[in-house]
């Protein structure tokens, strides 16, 4: 089913997957991440952090956008209606698309992601899919996030990468993000994991107690 939402599925509906210019403003990328933060009740990173990422990795830090051209989507839906295909549903979608043009203009970014491409000199080339966000209030049934990963995978193959790393998964595979990643039938590498070795037990105890409290306070402030 996931494969259905790749390639021609998005192209025919007016969605293109573009790479942002390295000098582009990051506010739109951060806005889309913010939509995911609110939806999932998590806290990611601010704009300053991503500026540092760009500075550190240069043109290897690639930001992708799933960009919807609503006029092309309108043409696509009008074509289906003219062929008498699922008229009630496509008429509803057409009305929705026209309303979006009135509200947001012809071009809308549905989702975004940040991928770090590997050093060309590296022996093992791994593209790292680090962050992603999407605005599910706009045409969520088009599954733009799937297309973003597909675009990143295609570019990583063209760059001669050995792997496209989607990041870690929860041990139970029951969390939302793990369920999304599993759709791509990944090869899962199991490592020992992470551990903490306190060098100052008093400071570490304070860190263990205060950090959860700080996170809760930040969530309350954002709400």
Where are these regions (language model features)?
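Short C-terminal domain-edge/linker segments immediately following a structured domain
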Residues: 13-19, 48-52, 149, 159-162, ...
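A conserved beta-strand-loop-helix scaffold within acyl/acetyltransferase catalytic domains
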Residues: 1-139
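Surface-exposed beta-strand edges and their flanking turn/coil or helix-capping segments
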Residues: 32, 78-81, 141-144, 178-179, ...
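Short alpha-helical interface patches
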Residues: 23, 27-34, 48-56, 146-156, ...
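Acyl-donor binding region in acyl/amide transferases
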Residues: 105-110, 122-186
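Secondary-structure transition/hinge residues
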Residues: 37, 41, 156-160, 189
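Active-site/acyl-donor-binding loops of N-acyltransferases
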Residues: 159-223
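Residue-level detector of alpha-helical recognition elements and their boundaries
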Residues: 44, 65, 144, 195-196
């Amino acid at each position: 089913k996931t494969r259905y939402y790749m390639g021609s599925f998005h192209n025919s509906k007016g969605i293109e997957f573009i790479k942002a210019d390295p000098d582009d403003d990051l506010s739109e990328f951060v806005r889309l991440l913010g939509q995911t933060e609110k939806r999932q009740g998590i806290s990611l990173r601010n704009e300053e952090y991503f500026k540092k990422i760009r500075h550190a990795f240069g043109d290897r830090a690639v930001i992708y956008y799933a960009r919807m051209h609503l006029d092309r989507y309108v043409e696509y839906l009008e074509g289906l209606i003219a062929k008498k295909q699922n008229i009630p549903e496509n008429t509803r979608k057409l009305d929705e698309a026209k309303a979006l043009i009135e509200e947001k203009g012809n071009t809308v970014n549905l989702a975004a992601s940040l991928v770090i491409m590997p050093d060309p000199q590296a022996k093992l080339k791994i593209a790292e899919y680090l962050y992603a966000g999407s605005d599910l209030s706009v045409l969520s049934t088009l599954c733009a996030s799937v297309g973003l990963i597909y675009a990143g995978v295609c570019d990583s193959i063209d760059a001669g990468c050995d792997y496209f790393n989607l990041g870690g998964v929860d041990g139970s595979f029951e969390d939302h993000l793990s369920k999304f990643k599993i759709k791509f039938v990944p090869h899962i590498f199991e490592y020992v994991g992470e551990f903490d070795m306190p060098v100052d037990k008093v400071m570490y105890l304070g860190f263990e107690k205060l950090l959860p409290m700080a996170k809760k306070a930040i969530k309350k402030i954002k709400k």
